[in-house]
């Protein structure tokens, strides 16, 4: 059975210090990597993200600020949505990211079948009912 994972690409400043030609080369490698994953069915979607956005917080979303405010190394610059056999396979794919040699960071996260907070609440209710 295939499992779903998201690769988050972090550190939006990985291009610093690279020439336009070097950036073009890496982006070409990145595109080829993604197209290969799409053609063999392991990647289902993937997109870069804009560097702008909004951050909503506070009760009832009262605070809306320009963002993201994360450090550049923590900011999410894009994602791939994968369907593969295991976390090990997703990690092996992530290790092939062409941006890693230039400071990009790839985070691999499994997609939950249900909200973890909801699952925790249901487990607590079952435990209390059994007590």
Residue ranges and their predicted role:
Residues 1-131:
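Conserved, structured core segments of small domains
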């Amino acid at each position: 059975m295939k499992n779903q994972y998201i690769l988050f690409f972090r550190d939006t400043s990985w291009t610093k210090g690279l020439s336009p030609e070097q950036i073009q080369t890496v982006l070409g490698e990145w595109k080829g990597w993604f197209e290969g994953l799409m053609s063999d069915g392991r990647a289902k979607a993937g997109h870069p993200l804009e560097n702008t956005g909004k951050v909503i917080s506070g009760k009832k979303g009262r605070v809306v600020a320009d963002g993201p405010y994360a450090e550049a190394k923590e900011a999410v610059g894009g994602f791939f949505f994968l369907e593969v056999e295991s976390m090990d396979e997703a990690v092996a794919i992530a290790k092939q990211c062409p941006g890693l040699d230039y400071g990009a960071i790839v985070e691999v996260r499994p997609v939950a079948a249900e909200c973890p907070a909801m699952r925790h609440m249901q487990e607590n209710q079952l435990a209390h009912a059994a007590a």
